[in-house]
From Swiss-Prot:
Pathway the protein takes part in: Porphyrin-containing compound metabolism; protoporphyrin-IX biosynthesis; coproporphyrinogen-III from 5-aminolevulinate: step 2/4
Protein name as catalogued: Porphobilinogen deaminase
PROSITE patterns, alphabetized: PORPHOBILINOGEN_DEAM
Other notes: The porphobilinogen subunits are added to the dipyrromethane group.
Keywords noted in UniProt: Porphyrin biosynthesis, Transferase
EC number of the protein: 2.5.1.61
Domain of life: Bacteria
Keyword tRNA processing assigned: no
HAMAP family: Porphobil_deam
Annotated SUPFAM superfamilies: Periplasmic binding protein-like II, Porphobilinogen deaminase (hydroxymethylbilane synthase), C-terminal domain
Subunit description: Monomer.
Originating organism: Corynebacterium aurimucosum (strain ATCC 700975 / DSM 44827 / CIP 107346 / CN-1)
Length: 296
């Protein structure tokens, strides 16, 4: 029986439940094992409590043998690889950002000064560029908590990853889903990262779940992030799509006040994923990314 380590939130257990089902389809018995992380109990902004706060506890639980497999939202993982583990990317969910607003409103329809909840610098900077009049409020908590702030009237809208809404069964709550070229998502958004200790039976099992296109796309996107030496809380975005067998990678660096948006793009074969990510980051540096990031 393989134990799958997961955070206890609805989204996390739903995601890990999918991994459990996929492993069972491959002939492996698996069960979920809840691991409490510091990020689940500390409601301070992620920028303050540290990159990887949601993932480190899961990795340590695997390392000490409490469970054999860890399931992460790939966008939450630090960019540096952890050499203890094999990492597999299964088939990817929707990469887009979603708005959940009162009265079915879209971003353009929100009234002047509307209160919008998000703590992600990447989202804040793009929101300010599109709607500088908005009152952007900090937001933490699970999906239910975040959506509840709109239902209660505390906020007029919140921004969330559409993939999380879909996985948790709340897709219909989205009042607007943004084209990734209009509102750029986090690198590896919509993708899961499944880890197991190298050389173990669990590592063999998760290898069966690997998806080639998702692996190449997320590698390119996360290379943009790592080359910029920016963490998962920086105002950096990356997305990609396929044009035939060509992978098209776009990256963005944004000033937190919305005053500057740097965008770069590269395309090539899946085998060149890392090179594409480096090419995008090189172009962003040429446009002044270092100055924009230093100012944050």
């Amino acid at each position: 029986m393989l134990k799958i380590g997961t955070r206890g939130s609805l989204l996390a257990t739903t995601q890990s439940g999918h991994v459990q089902e996929w492993l069972q389809q491959k002939g492996y018995e698996a069960e979920l094992h809840i691991v409490t992380t510091q990020g689940d109990v500390n409601m301070a902004p992620v920028e303050r409590i540290g990159v990887g706060v949601f993932t480190q506890a899961l990795r340590e639980a695997v390392d000490r043998g409490e469970c054999e497999i860890a399931v992460h939202s790939f966008k939450d993982l630090p960019t540096a690889a952890d050499e203890r583990f094999d990492l597999v990317v299964p088939q990817r969910q929707d990469v887009r950002e979603a708005l959940i607003a009162r009265d079915g409103l879209t971003l353009k329809e929100l009234p002047e000064g509307a209160r919008v909840g998000t703590s992600a610098p990447r989202r804040i900077s793009q929101l300010r560029a599109m709607r500088p009049d908005l009152d952007i409020r900090p937001l933490r908590g699970n999906i239910d908590t975040r959506m509840g702030k709109v239902t209660s009237g505390e906020l007029d809208a919140v921004l969330l990853a559409y993939a999380g809404l879909v996985r948790a069964g709340y897709a219909e709550r989205a009042t607007e889903v943004f084209d990734p070229e209009v509102f750029m998502p986090a690198p590896a958004q919509g993708a899961l990262a499944i880890e197991a200790v190298k050389g173990t039976e669990a590592a063999k099992a998760i290898a069966l779940l690997a998806d080639g296109p998702a692996t190449a796309a997320t590698r390119a996107e996360r290379t943009v992030l790592s080359q910029l030496e920016a963490g998962c809380t920086a105002p950096v975005a990356a997305t990609s799509h396929w044009e035939g067998e060509q992978l098209v990678v776009r990256g963005g660096v944004f000033a937190l006040d919305g005053s500057r948006q740097l965008i770069a793009q590269a395309q090539g074969a899946a085998s060149e994923a890392e090179e594409l990510g480096r090419a995008v980051s090189k172009e962003l540096f040429a446009q002044g990314a270092a100055d924009v990031l230093a100012a944050e």
